[in-house]
Amino acid sequence: MFFKIPQVLTPEALEKITTTLTEAEFVDGKLTAGWYAKLVKENQQLAKATPTAQALEEQVRQALQSNALFQTAIRPKTVHTLLFSRYGPGMAYGRHTDNALMNGMRSDVSFTLFLNEPSDYEGGELVIEGADSEQSYKLPAGTAIAYPSTSLHRVNVVTKGTRLVAVGWVQSWIRDAQKREIVFDLDVSRRSLFAQSGKTTEFDLLSKSVANLLRLWSE
């Protein structure tokens, strides 16, 4: 299940981040790619293990932690890896699947957080493959798209301008995407019921089911 998560970052936070990135040191994106992904990865990434990178990563993590939709839909145990990527003209990231394990943790959910507006560049769509179709995403600044890390995906070539994104990986409390979707649907339903009717018997039963499924499936 794919989730568009709007307004992860405020306009003020976006401006601060993009200004910082303008002056920051970027390195070859191949340095963080798996052995076969290096063959199709052509972008630049913010140098890791610098005070600038650590401060920006913490800012994004805090924004995700306070985002209700991200927390409910993804059930993050930890956001274990964050990268800031830049694509200029001619850059792209070909078809690949993300590594299953990163920094000793499982990658259940991948996300791309768009840092500049679609009008700032041409091309650069994130394309995620399904069983018999593809979905393309080029979203407003501050919006994230989250999707199962099991998915084949690519970034189309940027033909004009600069594409800025933060990409990250999550180990979820619930590793299976279908199970996460079931819990999410029940959680949304109980919250909607509570907003309409308050604390009813039906709300209590749905809340019990959400809690018990979390007990059953969390790891």
UniProtKB/Swiss-Prot annotation:
Q: What class of enzyme is it?
A: oxidoreductase
Q: Which UniProt keywords apply?
A: Dioxygenase, Iron, Metal-binding, Oxidoreductase, Vitamin C
Which Gene3D superfamilies does the UniProt entry name for this protein? q2cbj1_9rhob like domain, Rabenosyn, Rab binding domain
Family annotation (InterPro entries)? Oxoglu/Fe-dep_dioxygenase_dom, PKHD_hydroxylase, Pro_4_hyd_alph, Pro_4_hyd_alph_FE2OG_OXY
One GO biological-process annotation of the entry reads: DNA damage response
Q: Which residues bind 2-oxoglutarate?
A: R163
Spell out the disulfide connections.
Answer: none
Q: What is this protein called?
A: PKHD-type hydroxylase SYNPCC7002_A2658
Organism, scientific name: Picosynechococcus sp. (strain ATCC 27264 / PCC 7002 / PR-6)
Q: What is the lineage of its organism?
A: Bacteria, Bacillati, Cyanobacteriota, Cyanophyceae, Oscillatoriophycideae
